[in-house]
Amino acid sequence: MANDTMIDSTQLRRSPAAHLAAAMEAAEVAGERAVTLREVAFTTQLGLRAVPGSTGHAALAAATGVGLPAAVGEVAGDVSGTAVLWLGPDEFLLAAEENPALLDTLQGALGQEPGQVLDLSANRSVLQLEGPAAALVLRKSCPADLHPREFGVNRAITTSLANIPVLLWRTGEQSWRILPRASFTEHTVHWLIDAMSEFSAAEVA
């Protein structure tokens, strides 16, 4: 007899940092130098390619609902909804809460025009680092200038952290999203936990 039982695949999946959740929670620091780390699991990430000024670029800009960023560091939209991060003159990353329908929407908008819309949701993990000490943790191994004058809220760049390439997105005054390749998630989490440990001790006057 055939087994017609339907299996919901979402019940079987595991995010890149799922096995590290307890370690991240245990590393949380409270107080004046507070800092927390968590995974934002199963976000939708779409890679967009289109040449500025082209019909395809205009179609994708309209379909995202927030446009496309025009220069390095720019983000169209924000973390509360759909956001599009600038990766290159004709390359962008759309980031949103889980929404599989976005892929069909963007592919339909591009149609037969030159360009690409690819599902990259499994390509990168998303880590959220928050708190007054978050920027200090990042500065231990990130070469980018993180001063608010140079790296304001809702800016994003490609940089490195703990010697691996990441996308770094400042989502608030004291909050950052770090997007390493999924295969580097464990390395990144362990490095951040180690960097956070300093701030659990009393500050030396």
Curated annotation (Swiss-Prot):
GO biological process, one term: sarcosine catabolic process
Stated regulation of activity: Inhibited by Zn(2+), Cu(2+), Cd(2+), Hg(2+), Ag(+), p-chloromercuribenzoate (p-CMB), iodoacetamide, N-ethylmaleimide, CN(-), o-phenanthroline and sodium lauryl sulfate.
Chief place of localization: cytoplasm
Source species, domain of life: Bacteria
Compartment list: Cytoplasm
Keyword Cytoplasm belongs to the record: yes
Annotated thermal dependence: Optimum temperature is 37 degrees Celsius.
InterPro entries named in the record: SoxG (IPR007375), SoxG_het (IPR006280), TrmE/GcvT_dom1 (IPR027266)
Functional pH dependence: Optimum pH is 7.7 in potassium phosphate buffer and 8.0-8.5 in glycylglycine buffer.
E.C. code: 1.5.3.24
This protein's record includes keyword Cytoplasm: yes
GO CC term (a single one): cytoplasm
Keyword set, alphabetical order: Cytoplasm, Oxidoreductase
Catalyzed reaction equations: sarcosine + (6S)-5,6,7,8-tetrahydrofolate + O2 = (6R)-5,10-methylene-5,6,7,8-tetrahydrofolate + glycine + H2O2; sarcosine + O2 + H2O = formaldehyde + glycine + H2O2
GO MF terms, alphabetically ordered: sarcosine oxidase activity
Family statement drawn from the similarity comment of this UniProt entry: Belongs to the SoxG family.
Subunit structure, interactors included: Heterotetramer composed of subunits alpha (SoxA), beta (SoxB), gamma (SoxG) and delta (SoxD).
Function comment: In the presence of tetrahydrofolate, catalyzes the oxidative demethylation of sarcosine to yield glycine, 5,10-methylenetetrahydrofolate and hydrogen peroxide. In the absence of tetrahydrofolate, catalyzes the oxidative demethylation of sarcosine to yield glycine, formaldehyde and hydrogen peroxide. Can also use N-methyl-L-alanine and N-ethyl-L-glycine. Is very specific for oxygen as an acceptor.
Name of the molecule in the record: Sarcosine oxidase subunit gamma
Organism of this sequence: Corynebacterium sp. (strain U-96)
Lineage: Bacteria, Bacillati, Actinomycetota, Actinomycetes, Mycobacteriales
